[in-house]
């Protein structure tokens, strides 16, 4: 019986039987054991008989029969001879499919180095032998000898000898020593290595050495050697003596008509290897001259190289049509390789595609499926039904019936389709809502009908888009489709938790029109008893839709018991709103309907319905809203006519005023008062302002009309202009587009982003002249080209994000950490950009939240903050909350539900098994295509806002200055001399209300701690130039300011005023390159002045382009500008906007000129300067002084004697996330990346929850560098997963040993993906060759933890519905381990009990087979 079970188990060789995949080097014996025979001839197929040649590349004796159960000569045919080996042709009688799995081998006449281990950097063979790659190649390709056995000579092992040196040595020492060429030599060297001894030696060296580079090199080698020792791989296996041959069906040869063959490139490559190998064997037998043999060996090496990785070394071997042949390496890498083409994405059966059209009559869970398609897709189901009903006796008969499309077939199709969901998918599938399930409704025609409300999720429109249909076959699949993927279960967007089923376009316009008010409409002032009567009045023509009336409205409010209480009030409303109220579900307040509904308000309606009444009601409500919207949009009769674009009368005076201003600036420029750059900036500012004014005038004109009310007096009301209504409701178009239709087109951008200073004053209604048209095409075309390129970039970003985050899954409920992030509202300028509520909604509190000013606990820790609790926070005006975050989660592999918080798409705490990593990646990647390459473009129109130049406060409160340094000028105002000063206004309770960044050189009228009133202007500055502010009073002394060398003097002909302009270093003559133009301040006697309370000279270096309007010796007072530096013009500012910025952040790239941060806290001083750098010293209270060399042109924010904190900015620039992590820790870097990424998305109006970005940050931070290893398994300086270190530290703590010390490291997403523990995942991402080489040498094991690895080996993923399956497998594995530990005797005892008869056995077998079926 036991053997029987074993036999059955052996039969079911499924993918279930392994839990880990190991990759390693194959030894020659291993390759021979895989092989079914040696391939000796290069022949493939006999061209006449089409039979494979014996011993050739397709030999049937080695690889198996060509036809099922038939030997080659035809002696044995049929199943009864199964397993017989024919004595004539030597072919085993079995199935043909063995030709897909049986391998052969080639015995190489001379060893050959494996190119992957040789050329893949860093070269593994080179690292192992500690030799440079060039030297190894010289030996391998027979240019030099290498000493393999020095014997008693004074040669060294591994020394290279040229031909002459070798001959000399042979003369001197005869056969005392051994030196060889080619792969044999390398093989001998590798064989002779004692790995353990070498490891010991390196460890000692590591202890002794002090140099960093040496240390790195030794660590690298040591790691490789240890990997070899641990994995049991032998170094000499990197040189092959036996070459495996791929099974023939994986490199097919197909006869085409006309006697030609289509062949896989691999066959050519193998043929080449076999030919050269056979020729070499023959030469060796003939004992040919050395030089000929050598040449043949080199050619063999080259041909094997080409087979393994063509083009890796030298020129690629090409086929007949000059195309490089596709080698084994090419078969697995790249988008068309095995991993990405066949393992990660497969084409599936039971699918179809067609064009989509609107189905406005459908319910949200339905879609229209053309009958023809349905018949084809559901074929097997129809056959089964036809047979079981007895309409057809065989499948063949059923097939005929379906082909004839008999009447009964349609009835059965309708029955089969009932409640059988299908999946619709629109490419590109950017997030999980790109595939949703619907119930099909059979329709005539050939187009799929789609519900309009799901278009937003699919990003579909009906201009010819196509969609694919898939049929879930098994019961489980249907269940998943219905429970998880049904469109009605995907009302909320996983990216931000807002409804994604929101009406747009027609529906919005219809509802907006319906809920508008009109002064003095027909029937105004009527009293109506209920909405039904209102509808009656409208239908009979007694009242207009927009008339203001009084209606009795009955609202239903949920009471404590969960039942509805009715409440009726007489409400001032309009007919339309009363009619709309009829579709409102019970439990909604009328106030939400009693307003003019725009797109935002409608979205809020659906959101409220979902939150108050649950999913079902919300979905039904959304459907009703859609039907109503369509109906009333049709009744509104809105259309666009040319007269709707009303041009404001003021337009022409505004434009002529602007033209006058421009002319004035031009005069100033000609008279030398302003520089060219300043003139350009000011002109652009003037036109931008003019454009704004025209737009304002136009909107005022469009948006209001004057009417006579019932009393006969004129009154203003919102206009019923069609274009205005479309934009105002949010249905289509925007103010910016109407501006171009009826205002002026405004400033246009050139393709490089700079702005053309002559605007287009015409609009589309007036029409453009030729020049204006030409200017506008210039920028607009760039937009189109950008869009095409952008899509690819966006897709690639998504791919990298998914790859880095794919194995992050919710694995437990609570990790128990008290850590978290502190959330505060984001305030920019005078307004709250993001309120606290939005930041904490759906998060879990990390600590008890206390009532401000009291010790009372409002909300205990570990509570999920939902809408109600957020109301509590608002009511108590809490302004900072510490919430749990995935970045601080303590779970080892995965995250816990409490740290993640709410599942945004479902509205409750997230379930275990949810793949949060993939969701995060999709949420960030999906809007990627909307992020423009350059920041703003509206049809190429540039919107250069007039730059800010002052701070005007909006709230009364107290001024607070952060990081501020200033001097007081003689008007007793403050002049800032610090660079990142932040100014905040706080109210009486100390809550921040406004937040501004104030630049260097700004003049403040109020200081720290002073009161201000709303509307007061407290700071102003020149937006176009940056001053150099004098911090002491004194007299100007020029240093290195030499006319013609470092500066040019510009004198104005008209005014006679002269100014000095400093030249850029690049423009100067050689003599002036090293000079540093500086303004020094001296006292009346010419002595140096020091800055107050320091010993730093009052001297100011002038950067290039700075303009000095003072003369040598002029007197200056404190706070006066010494020089001004023109700021870069608008539009050409080098802000990487949009997608590239997001990519840079996630790749953790270092900016060009990064900010310099203080490495330690202490007092700043300056040491001895070198030619181009200054030496900055920071002296801490105790410990070593830190010093850093800083280039002189960097402007410093610190002065001598100043106290800095670790992580403070010393010199401005873009901050590097790596520095932030090192100096300020994990939380700071998380905050930095989240805020920076959010800035980009907010600018485009895209809402993404912070959680998703944090998930990616967690994955970027998952590696650590060991700083102190003690006696653990790690090496110092080694990069390890943080989770691994934590696990080891827990064990060490239990044993009472000191914990391993480590520093967190931030990796860019690409690097992090490649550094993952799973080699399968990394190999299928990028750089396949390098990853596989590294993994094989180290003998890596893949635990199949992530999603990708499991997809590749064809299993359910360990997330979602596959999560439980994997947990069960894990349990079974533990049970099996326990069972295996039962002693052998028990097993023998058990076996005795199993004495049974044949009948018993067969009965038992039947039972077992049934059980197996059930299990499946």
Swiss-Prot record:
InterPro entries, alphabetized: DNA-dir_RpoC_beta_prime (IPR045867), DNA-dir_RpoC_beta_prime_bact (IPR012754), RNA_pol_asu (IPR000722), RNA_pol_N (IPR006592), RNA_pol_Rpb1_1 (IPR007080), RNA_pol_Rpb1_3 (IPR007066), RNA_pol_Rpb1_3_sf (IPR042102), RNA_pol_Rpb1_4 (IPR007083)
SMART domains: RPOLA_N
UniProt binding sites for Mg(2+): 461, 463, 465
Catalytic activity: RNA(n) + a ribonucleoside 5'-triphosphate = RNA(n+1) + diphosphate
Gene Ontology MF annotations: DNA binding; DNA-directed RNA polymerase activity; magnesium ion binding; zinc ion binding
GO biological process, one term: DNA-templated transcription
Binding residues for Zn(2+) 1: 71, 73, 86, 89
EC number: 2.7.7.6
Cross-referenced CDD domains: RNAP_beta'_C, RNAP_beta'_N
Gene3D superfamilies linked to this entry: 1.10.132.30, 1.10.150.390, 1.10.1790.20, 1.10.40.90, 2.40.40.20, 2.40.50.100, RNA polymerase II, clamp domain, RNA polymerase Rpb1, domain 3
Cofactors demanded by this protein: Mg(2+); Zn(2+)
Alphabetical list of Pfam families matching this protein: RNA_pol_Rpb1_1, RNA_pol_Rpb1_2, RNA_pol_Rpb1_3, RNA_pol_Rpb1_4, RNA_pol_Rpb1_5
Annotated positions binding Zn(2+) 2: 815, 889, 896, 899
UniProt keyword annotations, A-Z: DNA-directed RNA polymerase, Magnesium, Metal-binding, Nucleotidyltransferase, Transcription, Transferase, Zinc
Single GO cellular component term: DNA-directed RNA polymerase complex
Cofactor note: Binds 1 Mg(2+) ion per subunit. Binds 2 Zn(2+) ions per subunit.
Role summary: DNA-dependent RNA polymerase catalyzes the transcription of DNA into RNA using the four ribonucleoside triphosphates as substrates.
Family: Belongs to the RNA polymerase beta' chain family.
Quaternary data: The RNAP catalytic core consists of 2 alpha, 1 beta, 1 beta' and 1 omega subunit. When a sigma factor is associated with the core the holoenzyme is formed, which can initiate transcription.
Record protein name field: DNA-directed RNA polymerase subunit beta'
Originating organism: Haemophilus influenzae (strain 86-028NP)
């Amino acid at each position: 019986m036991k053997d029987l079970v074993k036999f059955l188990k052996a039969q079911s060789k499924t993918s279930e039987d392994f839990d880990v995949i190991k990759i390693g080097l194959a030894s020659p014996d291993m390759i021979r054991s895989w092989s079914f025979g040696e391939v000796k001839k290069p022949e493939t197929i006999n061209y006449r008989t089409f039979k494979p040649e014996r011993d050739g590349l397709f030999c049937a004796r080695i690889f198996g029969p060509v036809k099922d159960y038939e030997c080659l000569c035809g002696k044995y045919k049929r199943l009864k001879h199964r397993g017989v080996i024919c004595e004539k042709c030597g072919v085993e009688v079995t199935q043909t499919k063995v030709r897909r799995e049986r391998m052969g081998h080639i015995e190489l006449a001379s060893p050959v180095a494996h190119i992957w281990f040789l050329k893949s950097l860093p070269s593994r063979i080179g690292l192992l032998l500690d030799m440079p790659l060039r030297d190894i190649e010289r030996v391998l390709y027979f240019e030099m000898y290498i000493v393999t056995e020095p014997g008693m000579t004074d040669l060294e092992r591994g020394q290279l000898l040229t031909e002459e040196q070798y001959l000399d040595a042979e003369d001197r020492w005869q056969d005392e020593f051994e030196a060889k060429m080619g792969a044999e030599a390398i093989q001998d060297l590798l064989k002779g290595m004692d790995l353990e001894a070498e490891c010991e030696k390196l460890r000692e060296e590591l202890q002794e050495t002090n140099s960093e580079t040496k240390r790195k090199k030794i660590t690298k080698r040591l790691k490789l050697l240890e990997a070899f020792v641990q994995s049991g791989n032998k170094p000499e296996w990197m040189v092959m003596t036996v070459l495996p041959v791929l099974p023939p069906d994986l490199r097919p040869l197909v006869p085409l008509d006309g006697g030609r063959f289509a062949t896989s490139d691999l066959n050519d490559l193998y043929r080449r290897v076999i030919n050269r190998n056979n020729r070499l064997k023959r030469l060796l037998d003939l004992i040919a001259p050395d030089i000929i043999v050598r040449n043949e060996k080199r050619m063999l090496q080259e041909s094997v190289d080409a087979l393994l990785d063509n083009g890796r070394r030298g020129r690629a071997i090409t086929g007949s049509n000059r195309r490089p042949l596709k080698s084994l390496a090419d078969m697995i890498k790249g988008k068309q390789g095995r991993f990405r083409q066949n393992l990660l994405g497969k084409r599936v059966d039971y699918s179809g595609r067609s064009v989509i059209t609107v189905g406005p009559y459908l319910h949200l869970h339905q879609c229209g499926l053309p009958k023809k398609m349905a018949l084809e897709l559901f074929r097997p189901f129809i056959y089964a039904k036809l047979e079981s009903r007895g309409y057809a006796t065989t499948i063949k008969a059923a097939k005929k019936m379906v082909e004839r499309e008999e009447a009964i077939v349609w009835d059965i199709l309708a029955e089969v389709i009932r409640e059988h969901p299908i999946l619709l998918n629109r490419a590109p599938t950017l997030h999980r809502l790109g595939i949703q399930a619907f119930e099909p409704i059979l329709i005539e025609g050939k187009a799929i009908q789609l519900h309009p409300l799901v278009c937003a999720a699919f990003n579909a429109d009906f201009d010819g888009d196509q969609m694919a249909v898939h049929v879930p076959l098994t019961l489980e699949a249907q269940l998943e489709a219905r429970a998880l993927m049904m469109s009605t279960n995907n009302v909320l967007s996983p990216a931000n938790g807002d409804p994604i089923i929101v009406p747009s376009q027609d529906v919005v316009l219809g509802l907006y029109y319906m809920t508008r008010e009109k002064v003095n409409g027909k029937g105004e002032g009527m009293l109506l008893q209920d909405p039904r009567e209102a509808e009656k009045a409208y239908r009979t023509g007694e009242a207009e839709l927009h008339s203001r009336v009084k209606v009795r409205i009955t609202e239903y409010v949920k009471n404590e018991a969960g039942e509805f209480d009715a409440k009726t009030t007489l409400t001032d409303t309009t007919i339309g709103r009363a009619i709309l109220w009829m579709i409102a579900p019970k439990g909604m307040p009328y106030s939400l309907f009693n307003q003019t509904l725009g797109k935002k308000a409608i979205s809020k309606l659906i959101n409220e319905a979902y939150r108050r009444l649950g999913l079902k009601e919300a979905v039904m409500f959304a459907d009703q809203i859609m039907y109503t919207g369509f109906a009333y949009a049709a009744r509104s009769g809105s259309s666009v006519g040319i007269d709707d674009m009303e041009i404001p009368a003021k337009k022409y005076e505004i434009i002529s005023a602007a033209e006058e201003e421009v002319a004035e600036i031009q005069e100033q420029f000609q008279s030398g008062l302003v520089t060219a750059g300043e003139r350009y900036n000011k002109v652009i500012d003037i036109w931008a302002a003019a454009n704004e004014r025209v737009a304002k005038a136009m909107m005022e004109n469009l948006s209001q009309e004057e009417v006579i009310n019932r009393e006969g007096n004129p009154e203003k009301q919102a206009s019923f202009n069609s274009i205005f209504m479309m934009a105002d409701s949010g249905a289509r178009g925007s103010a910016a587009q109407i501006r171009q239709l009826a205002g002026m087109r405004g400033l246009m951008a050139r393709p490089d982003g700079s702005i053309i200073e002559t605007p287009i004053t015409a609009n589309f209604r007036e029409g453009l002249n030729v020049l204006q048209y030409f200017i506008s095409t210039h920028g607009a075309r760039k937009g189109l080209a950008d869009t095409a390129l952008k899509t690819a970039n966006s897709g690639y970003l998504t791919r990298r994000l998914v790859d880095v985050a794919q194995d992050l899954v919710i694995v437990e409920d609570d990790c128990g950490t008290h850590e978290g992030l502190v959330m505060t509202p984001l305030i920019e300028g005078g307004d709250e950009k993001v309120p606290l509520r939005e930041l904490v909604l759906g998060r879990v509190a990390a600590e008890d939240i206390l009532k401000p000013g009291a010790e009372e606990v409002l909300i205990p820790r570990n509570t999920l903050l939902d809408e109600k609790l957020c109301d509590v926070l608002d009511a108590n005006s809490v302004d900072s909350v510490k919430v749990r975050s995935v970045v601080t989660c303590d779970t080892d592999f995965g995250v816990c539900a409490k740290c993640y918080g709410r599942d945004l798409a479902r509205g409750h705490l997230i379930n275990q098994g949810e793949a949060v990593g993939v969701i995060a990646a999709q949420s960030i990647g999906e809007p990627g295509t909307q992020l423009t390459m350059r920041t703003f473009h509206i049809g190429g129109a540039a919107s250069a806002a007039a730059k800010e130049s002052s701070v005007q406060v909006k709230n009364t409160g107290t001024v607070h200055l952060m990081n501020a340094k200033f001097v007081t000028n003689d008007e007793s105002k403050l002049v800032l001399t610090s660079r990142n000063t932040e100014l905040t206004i706080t109210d009486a309770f100390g809550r921040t209300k406004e937040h501004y960044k104030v630049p260097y050189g700004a003049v403040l009228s109020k200081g720290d701690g002073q009161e201000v009133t709303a509307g007061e202007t407290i700071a102003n500055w020149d937006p176009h130039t940056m001053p150099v502010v004098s911090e002491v009073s004194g007299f100007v002394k020029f240093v290195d300011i030499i006319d013609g060398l470092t500066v040019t003097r510009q004198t104005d002909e008209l005014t006679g005023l002269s100014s000095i302009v400093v030249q850029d270093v690049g423009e100067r003559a050689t003599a002036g390159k090293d000079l540093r133009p500086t303004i020094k301040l001296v006292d009346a006697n010419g002595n140096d002045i020091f800055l107050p309370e320091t010993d730093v000279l009052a001297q100011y270096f002038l950067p290039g382009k700075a303009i000095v309007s003072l003369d040598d010796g002029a007197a200056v007072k404190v706070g006066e500008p010494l020089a001004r530096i023109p700021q870069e013009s608008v539009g050409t500012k080098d802000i990487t906007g949009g997608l590239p910025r997001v990519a840079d952040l996630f790749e953790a790239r270092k900016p060009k000129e990064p900010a310099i941060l203080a490495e330690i806290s202490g007092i700043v001083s300056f040491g001895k300067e070198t030619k181009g750098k200054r030496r900055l010293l920071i002296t801490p209270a105790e410990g070593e002084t830190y010093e850093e060399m800083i280039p002189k042109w960097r402007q410093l924010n610190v002065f001598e004697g100043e106290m800095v904190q670790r992580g403070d900015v010393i010199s401005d620039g873009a901050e590097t996330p790596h520095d932030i992590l090192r100096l300020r820790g994990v939380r700071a870097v998380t905050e930095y990346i989240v805020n920076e990424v959010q800035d980009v998305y907010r600018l485009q109006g895209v809402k993404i929850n912070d959680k998703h970005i944090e998930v990616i940050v967690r994955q970027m931070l998952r590696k650590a560098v060991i700083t102190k290893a003690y006696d653990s398994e790690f090496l110092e300086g080694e990069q390890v997963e943080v989770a691994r270190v934590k696990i080891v530290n827990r064990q060490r703590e239990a044993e009472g040993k000191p914990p391993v010390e480590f520093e967190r490291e931030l990796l860019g997403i690409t690097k992090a993906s490649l550094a993952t523990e799973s080699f399968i995942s990394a190999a299928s991402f990028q750089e396949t060759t390098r990853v596989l080489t590294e993994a094989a040498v180290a003998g890596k094991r893949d635990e199949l933890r992530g999603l990708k690895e499991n997809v590749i080996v064809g299993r359910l993923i360990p997330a979602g519905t596959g999560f439980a399956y994997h947990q069960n497998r894990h349990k079974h594995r533990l049970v099996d381990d326990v069972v295996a530990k039962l002693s052998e005797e028990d097993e023998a005892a058990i076996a005795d009990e199993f004495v049974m008869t044949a009948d018993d056995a067969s009965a038992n077998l039947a039972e077992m087979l049934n059980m197996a079926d059930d299990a499946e």
